[in-house]
């Protein structure tokens, strides 16, 4: 999953970067309001961690621009030193998914991100059962019959993203963007994603049939449940 950190306090931004990268997230940074608005206009993100006190403007303006874009469901967590209740209410009213006052624990941030994933995809817990495969979002593991599969980080991310979007066709471009980040930085070979999906499907099929894992010709993939 990809995350845009909009935070001008570089030490905090880099701490979040290191912590979330170790948890498997793909990180991008925007240090100012202008660069944040430019990025969200071009790319979509699974999460936007948004500071309100930016050097060239208010983070609320970034939130407003995001919400004005069509067909976007980027989850927004506001991170700010502002403690006023009015600011919290304003952020939530304008479409933020959560509000975390500074200073905060990185583990709490991660827990809130997991909670948003559960709400967004209507999950009761961090585990999802897909045709006998148990995907654990928090531990980033996939197992079958109590045996853990040896998936690479990217294979897990692909499976995770497809599972969270089950019964929907996920395009190759969308999959690339959410697993590898900025699509412009990814190998332009059209077979790039297909190779990773082929390896993932091979590992899944080795323990159980995967006729539910569909390739939608010329578009992408779909997991049917």
PLM region descriptions:
Residues 1-120:
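N-terminal/domain-start alpha-helical segments
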Residues 71, 121-125, 185, 208-210:
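Nucleotide second-messenger and two-component phosphorelay signaling modules
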Residues 82-84, 107, 125-127, 141, ...:
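A short, glycine- and basic residue-enriched loop/turn
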Residues 115-128, 167-169:
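The C-terminal output helix
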Residues 129-141, 219:
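Short boundary/linker motifs that mark transitions into or out of structured domains
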Residues 141, 146-211, 217:
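Positively charged, aromatic-enriched patches within helix-turn-helix-type DNA-binding elements
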Residues 221-224:
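Conserved active-site beta-strand element of glycosyltransferases/polysaccharide synthases
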């Amino acid at each position: 999953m990809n995350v845009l950190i909009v935070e001008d306090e570089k030490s905090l931004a880099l701490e979040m970067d290191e912590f979330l990268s170790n948890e498997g997230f793909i990180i991008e940074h925007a240090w100012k309001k202008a660069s944040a608005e430019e990025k969200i206009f071009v790319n979509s993100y699974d999460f936007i961690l948004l500071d309100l006190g930016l050097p060239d403007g208010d983070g609320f303006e970034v939130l407003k621009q995001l919400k004005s874009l069509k067909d976007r469901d980027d989850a927004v967590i506001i991170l700010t030193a502002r403690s006023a209740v009015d600011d919290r209410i304003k952020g939530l009213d304008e479409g933020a998914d959560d509000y975390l006052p500074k200073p905060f624990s990185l583990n709490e941030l991660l827990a809130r991100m997991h909670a948003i994933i559960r709400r967004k995809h209507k999950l009761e817990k961090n585990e999802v059962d897909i045709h006998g495969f148990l995907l654990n979002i928090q531990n980033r593991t996939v197992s079958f019959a109590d045996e853990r599969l040896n998936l690479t980080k990217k294979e897990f991310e692909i499976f995770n993203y497809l599972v969270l979007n089950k019964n929907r066709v996920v395009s190759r471009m969308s999959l690339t963007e959410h697993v590898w980040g900025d699509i412009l930085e990814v190998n332009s070979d059209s077979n790039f994603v297909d190779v990773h999906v082929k390896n993932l499907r091979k590992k899944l099929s080795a323990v159980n049939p995967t006729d539910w894992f569909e390739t939608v010709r010329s578009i992408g993939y779909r997991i049917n449940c």
